[in-house]
Amino acid sequence: MKLTCVMIVAVLFLTANTFVTAVPHSSNVLENLYLKARHEMENPEASKLNTRYDCEPPGNFCGMIKVGPPCCSGWCFFACA
């Protein structure tokens, strides 16, 4: 019983220690993430999540023989729509 309690306390202490020491100045990091997210909400053009680099733009060939990324729009009829 005592060993179980000691193990639980040790695990809790090590977990808390890991979270505290994982990111130096964690309050600044969280603040910067909040400001960046707020900026992206106000200006959706600034969001990198809306940009797809793994797809073909409209007008590019997308036939059956082509091996590569799919069309950004999802529509293909010999050329991306």
From Swiss-Prot:
Disulphide bonds in the chain: 55-72, 62-76, 71-80
Highest taxon of the lineage: Eukaryota
Entry keywords, A to Z: Disulfide bond, Ion channel impairing toxin, Knottin, Neurotoxin, Presynaptic neurotoxin, Secreted, Signal, Toxin
Entry's Gene Ontology molecular function annotations: ion channel inhibitor activity; toxin activity
Subcellular location per the Swiss-Prot or TrEMBL entry: Secreted
Propeptide span(s): 23-51
Tissues where the protein occurs: Expressed by the venom duct.
Secretion signal span: 1-22
Pfam families, per database record: Conotoxin
Job of this protein: Omega-conotoxins act at presynaptic membranes, they bind and block voltage-gated calcium channels. Act on high voltage-activated (HVA) calcium currents in molluscan neurons.
Family the UniProt entry places it in: Belongs to the conotoxin O1 superfamily.
Free-text comment on this protein's domains from its UniProt entry: The presence of a 'disulfide through disulfide knot' structurally defines this protein as a knottin. The cysteine framework is VI/VII (C-C-CC-C-C).
Protein name: Omega-conotoxin-like Vc6.4
Species name: Conus victoriae
